[in-house]
A protein has these predicted regions:
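Short S/T/G/P-rich N-terminal loop/turn motif that feeds into the first structured element of a domain
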Residues: 1-232
Protein backbone atom coordinates (compact mmCIF):
# COMPACT_ATOMS: atom_id res chain seq x y z
CA UNK A 1 0.00 0.00 0.00
CA UNK A 2 1.33 3.45 -0.93
CA UNK A 3 2.36 5.77 1.89
CA UNK A 4 0.02 8.71 2.56
CA UNK A 5 1.12 12.20 1.57
CA UNK A 6 0.63 15.41 3.48
CA UNK A 7 0.56 19.03 2.42
CA UNK A 8 1.70 21.44 5.12
CA UNK A 9 0.62 25.03 4.47
CA UNK A 10 1.66 28.06 6.50
CA UNK A 11 -0.26 31.26 5.81
CA UNK A 12 1.73 34.16 7.23
CA UNK A 13 -0.27 37.16 8.36
CA UNK A 14 1.01 40.70 8.54
CA UNK A 15 -1.48 41.89 11.14
CA UNK A 16 -3.40 40.10 13.87
CA UNK A 17 -6.59 41.72 12.57
CA UNK A 18 -6.37 39.53 9.44
CA UNK A 19 -6.89 36.36 11.49
CA UNK A 20 -10.68 36.52 11.82
CA UNK A 21 -11.23 37.14 8.14
CA UNK A 22 -8.90 34.32 7.08
CA UNK A 23 -10.34 31.78 9.51
CA UNK A 24 -13.88 32.69 8.47
CA UNK A 25 -12.99 32.13 4.82
CA UNK A 26 -11.32 28.80 5.53
CA UNK A 27 -14.32 27.55 7.49
CA UNK A 28 -17.16 28.87 5.32
CA UNK A 29 -15.65 28.85 1.84
CA UNK A 30 -12.57 26.64 1.60
CA UNK A 31 -13.49 23.70 3.84
CA UNK A 32 -16.74 22.82 1.98
CA UNK A 33 -14.81 22.84 -1.30
CA UNK A 34 -12.06 20.61 0.11
CA UNK A 35 -14.75 18.17 1.23
CA UNK A 36 -16.56 18.38 -2.11
CA UNK A 37 -13.40 17.40 -3.98
CA UNK A 38 -12.55 14.53 -1.63
CA UNK A 39 -9.52 15.84 0.15
CA UNK A 40 -8.65 13.65 3.15
CA UNK A 41 -8.44 14.53 6.83
CA UNK A 42 -7.74 18.23 7.29
CA UNK A 43 -6.34 20.20 10.18
CA UNK A 44 -6.45 23.96 10.63
CA UNK A 45 -4.54 25.61 13.47
CA UNK A 46 -3.42 28.99 14.67
CA UNK A 47 0.32 29.21 15.28
CA UNK A 48 1.01 30.24 18.87
CA UNK A 49 4.79 29.73 18.76
CA UNK A 50 6.80 29.38 15.58
CA UNK A 51 9.22 31.01 13.17
CA UNK A 52 6.47 33.33 11.90
CA UNK A 53 3.51 34.68 13.87
CA UNK A 54 0.73 35.52 13.47
CA UNK A 55 0.09 32.61 11.11
CA UNK A 56 -2.36 29.84 10.27
CA UNK A 57 -1.12 26.28 9.76
CA UNK A 58 -3.00 23.74 7.65
CA UNK A 59 -2.58 20.02 6.98
CA UNK A 60 -4.18 18.35 3.97
CA UNK A 61 -3.93 14.57 3.55
CA UNK A 62 -3.93 12.34 0.47
CA UNK A 63 -3.71 8.56 -0.01
CA UNK A 64 -1.09 9.00 -2.75
CA UNK A 65 0.83 11.62 -4.70
CA UNK A 66 -1.36 10.94 -7.74
CA UNK A 67 -4.53 11.58 -5.72
CA UNK A 68 -3.08 14.85 -4.45
CA UNK A 69 -2.57 15.96 -8.04
CA UNK A 70 -6.07 14.80 -8.99
CA UNK A 71 -7.72 16.54 -6.02
CA UNK A 72 -6.14 19.87 -6.90
CA UNK A 73 -7.05 19.42 -10.57
CA UNK A 74 -10.69 19.02 -9.53
CA UNK A 75 -10.43 22.05 -7.28
CA UNK A 76 -8.78 24.26 -9.91
CA UNK A 77 -11.53 23.39 -12.41
CA UNK A 78 -14.30 24.39 -9.99
CA UNK A 79 -15.77 27.85 -10.65
CA UNK A 80 -16.88 28.05 -7.01
CA UNK A 81 -13.23 27.77 -5.94
CA UNK A 82 -12.22 30.54 -8.32
CA UNK A 83 -14.99 32.72 -6.89
CA UNK A 84 -13.93 31.93 -3.32
CA UNK A 85 -10.31 32.88 -4.05
CA UNK A 86 -11.43 36.10 -5.73
CA UNK A 87 -13.52 36.92 -2.67
CA UNK A 88 -10.53 36.34 -0.37
CA UNK A 89 -8.23 38.49 -2.49
CA UNK A 90 -10.70 41.34 -2.85
CA UNK A 91 -9.66 44.61 -1.23
CA UNK A 92 -6.90 44.07 1.34
CA UNK A 93 -5.11 40.69 1.32
CA UNK A 94 -5.93 38.25 4.12
CA UNK A 95 -2.28 37.11 4.38
CA UNK A 96 1.00 38.13 2.82
CA UNK A 97 2.74 34.82 2.12
CA UNK A 98 1.95 31.14 1.66
CA UNK A 99 4.61 28.48 2.36
CA UNK A 100 3.82 24.94 1.22
CA UNK A 101 5.68 21.67 1.76
CA UNK A 102 4.86 18.15 0.59
CA UNK A 103 5.62 15.26 2.93
CA UNK A 104 5.42 11.47 2.70
CA UNK A 105 4.53 9.34 5.71
CA UNK A 106 7.30 7.18 7.12
CA UNK A 107 6.91 3.42 7.35
CA UNK A 108 6.32 3.70 11.12
CA UNK A 109 3.74 6.51 11.03
CA UNK A 110 0.18 5.88 12.19
CA UNK A 111 -2.56 7.06 9.81
CA UNK A 112 -3.67 10.61 10.51
CA UNK A 113 -7.35 10.33 11.42
CA UNK A 114 -10.02 12.99 11.97
CA UNK A 115 -11.52 13.32 15.41
CA UNK A 116 -14.62 11.22 16.00
CA UNK A 117 -17.85 12.90 17.18
CA UNK A 118 -17.63 13.52 20.90
CA UNK A 119 -13.84 13.28 21.06
CA UNK A 120 -12.34 15.97 23.30
CA UNK A 121 -10.39 18.73 21.60
CA UNK A 122 -6.69 18.82 22.39
CA UNK A 123 -5.61 22.22 23.65
CA UNK A 124 -2.19 22.10 22.02
CA UNK A 125 -0.29 20.40 19.22
CA UNK A 126 3.48 20.43 18.91
CA UNK A 127 5.02 20.12 15.46
CA UNK A 128 8.70 19.15 15.58
CA UNK A 129 10.88 19.17 12.46
CA UNK A 130 14.27 17.43 12.64
CA UNK A 131 16.81 18.39 9.98
CA UNK A 132 19.53 15.86 9.12
CA UNK A 133 22.81 16.73 7.36
CA UNK A 134 22.37 14.02 4.69
CA UNK A 135 19.76 11.58 3.41
CA UNK A 136 21.83 8.72 4.82
CA UNK A 137 21.73 10.27 8.28
CA UNK A 138 17.98 10.79 7.98
CA UNK A 139 17.85 7.01 7.53
CA UNK A 140 19.70 6.61 10.83
CA UNK A 141 17.13 8.94 12.41
CA UNK A 142 14.36 6.67 11.13
CA UNK A 143 16.19 3.69 12.62
CA UNK A 144 16.40 5.42 15.99
CA UNK A 145 12.71 6.26 16.08
CA UNK A 146 11.58 2.82 14.93
CA UNK A 147 14.21 1.12 17.09
CA UNK A 148 12.99 2.28 20.46
CA UNK A 149 12.38 6.03 20.60
CA UNK A 150 8.69 5.78 19.73
CA UNK A 151 8.14 3.16 22.43
CA UNK A 152 9.84 5.49 24.93
CA UNK A 153 7.59 8.32 23.74
CA UNK A 154 4.49 6.31 24.49
CA UNK A 155 5.71 5.31 27.95
CA UNK A 156 6.33 9.00 28.69
CA UNK A 157 2.86 10.15 27.61
CA UNK A 158 3.94 11.40 24.17
CA UNK A 159 1.77 10.03 21.36
CA UNK A 160 2.58 11.48 17.92
CA UNK A 161 -0.19 11.18 15.33
CA UNK A 162 2.09 11.32 12.29
CA UNK A 163 5.71 11.04 11.19
CA UNK A 164 6.60 12.22 7.69
CA UNK A 165 9.60 13.18 5.56
CA UNK A 166 9.60 16.40 3.55
CA UNK A 167 10.04 15.57 -0.14
CA UNK A 168 9.29 19.07 -1.49
CA UNK A 169 10.08 22.03 0.72
CA UNK A 170 12.85 23.81 2.62
CA UNK A 171 15.65 22.45 4.82
CA UNK A 172 15.68 18.95 3.40
CA UNK A 173 16.34 16.25 4.37
CA UNK A 174 14.07 16.43 7.38
CA UNK A 175 11.42 14.51 9.26
CA UNK A 176 8.41 16.10 10.94
CA UNK A 177 6.16 14.69 13.62
CA UNK A 178 3.01 16.03 15.27
CA UNK A 179 2.06 15.52 18.92
CA UNK A 180 -1.26 16.35 20.64
CA UNK A 181 -1.25 17.43 24.28
CA UNK A 182 -4.05 18.14 26.73
CA UNK A 183 -2.25 21.22 28.03
CA UNK A 184 1.12 22.94 28.29
CA UNK A 185 1.57 21.31 31.72
CA UNK A 186 0.94 17.88 30.16
CA UNK A 187 3.56 18.62 27.52
CA UNK A 188 6.20 19.75 30.02
CA UNK A 189 5.65 16.72 32.25
CA UNK A 190 5.78 14.22 29.37
CA UNK A 191 8.98 15.65 27.91
CA UNK A 192 10.63 15.73 31.35
CA UNK A 193 9.86 12.03 31.85
CA UNK A 194 11.25 11.24 28.41
CA UNK A 195 14.46 13.25 28.81
CA UNK A 196 15.20 11.69 32.20
CA UNK A 197 14.89 8.13 30.87
CA UNK A 198 18.38 6.55 30.91
CA UNK A 199 17.36 4.26 28.05
CA UNK A 200 16.82 7.36 25.90
CA UNK A 201 20.28 8.66 26.73
CA UNK A 202 21.76 5.30 25.74
CA UNK A 203 19.74 5.13 22.50
CA UNK A 204 20.79 8.64 21.51
CA UNK A 205 24.46 7.90 22.22
CA UNK A 206 24.26 4.75 20.10
CA UNK A 207 22.67 6.64 17.20
CA UNK A 208 25.50 9.20 17.32
CA UNK A 209 28.08 6.42 17.36
CA UNK A 210 26.52 4.89 14.25
CA UNK A 211 25.68 7.99 12.23
CA UNK A 212 27.25 11.04 13.85
CA UNK A 213 25.10 14.05 14.70
CA UNK A 214 22.07 12.85 12.75
CA UNK A 215 20.00 15.89 13.81
CA UNK A 216 21.56 19.29 13.17
CA UNK A 217 18.57 21.55 13.76
CA UNK A 218 15.13 21.27 15.37
CA UNK A 219 12.21 23.59 14.61
CA UNK A 220 9.29 23.64 17.05
CA UNK A 221 5.83 25.02 16.42
CA UNK A 222 3.00 25.16 18.95
CA UNK A 223 -0.39 24.92 17.27
CA UNK A 224 -3.92 25.42 18.60
CA UNK A 225 -6.69 23.67 16.62
CA UNK A 226 -9.51 25.82 15.29
CA UNK A 227 -13.13 24.97 16.05
CA UNK A 228 -13.58 23.61 12.50
CA UNK A 229 -10.41 21.52 12.32
CA UNK A 230 -11.04 17.84 11.57
CA UNK A 231 -7.80 17.04 13.40
CA UNK A 232 -8.32 18.27 16.94
Amino acid sequence: MAAPYYEFVVLRLQFGSQMGRLLGWLEKRALPLFQKHRFGSMGFFTVEVGPHIPAVFGILTYPSFAEMDAAWARMDADHDYAAAVAELEKDEPAFYREDTSILRATSFSPPLKPAAPGDPMHKLYELRIYESPTQRQLGYLHDRFAGGEIEMFHKSGIHPVLYADTIIGPNRPNMAYLIPFESEAHREKAWAVFRDNPDWQQLRAESIRRGGEIVRNITNMFLVPTSFSMIR
